[in-house]
UniProtKB/Swiss-Prot annotation:
The lineage of its organism: Bacteria, Pseudomonadati, Pseudomonadota, Alphaproteobacteria, Hyphomicrobiales. The active site is at 126 (proton acceptor). Its EC number is 2.3.1.286. The gene is cobB. One of its GO terms (cellular component) is cytoplasm. It is an enzyme of class 2 (transferase). Its main location: cytoplasm. Zn(2+) binds at residues 134, 137, 159, 162. Its cofactor is Zn(2+). Gene3D superfamilies: 2.20.28.200, TPP-binding domain (3.40.50.1220). This is NAD-dependent protein deacetylase. It holds the Pfam family SIR2. Nicotinamide binds at residues 40, 108-109. The keyword Transferase applies.
Amino acid sequence: MIAPSLSSGVEQLGDMIAHASSIVPFTGAGISTESGIPDFRSPGGLWSRNQPIPFDEFVARQDARDEAWRRRFAMEQTFAKARPARGHRALASLYKAGKVPAIITQNIDNLHQVSGFAEHDVVELHGNTTYARCIGCGKRHELDWVREWFFRTGHAPHCTACDEPVKTATVSFGQSMPSDAMRRATELAQHCDLFIAIGSSLVVWPAAGFPMLAKECGAKLVIINREPTEQDEIADLVIRHDIGETLGPFVGN
């Protein structure tokens, strides 16, 4: 059902939240645009100007690794200045109230943690851009160290433990999805009674399968997104309005 108006959608969503005992939010890029982080897939977004660097190219070529880190540091101020928007804060309020056991996100910006979610309760399907990992041994490297290395040498860094390449702790095209995050997201979708997909076009698989899984397992499904999605027809409620305006009334409540 598509909400006929914003107020109607908010009222229906509030009623569904009140009657739910285990709510699992699933967030995409749309929730962070209010924080100043662009949706990379949108027209004019980063990927319309620069093709993503596939994982196998990153592994094989020094110039690809250098370019990947150049792009990351070109976005430095965007990520550094970003603060949780109304959508993030509303979900954090529901989490603190005990309604939300954990959150599933496609985002890499760390804003759910900043908004108040414990790190272990944020299931990051596509990783996190605020630190780096060795692609060999998995050792974590902080961005301050990477930045110093990159601007001193002009090249992407190598791990201090095993000398393999270091990349942002994000999932690149062609890179395997994190198995622990996929397992946890599956469990959350299977056992919630309300699944809310927020700011996602629901076209990137396998992540887009979680709303369908939740619905198949008996949960109510809400989709909050300005544009239509292919899963609108199976949703119990579709709200095609601004995320901040839709979730804003739930901040602190």
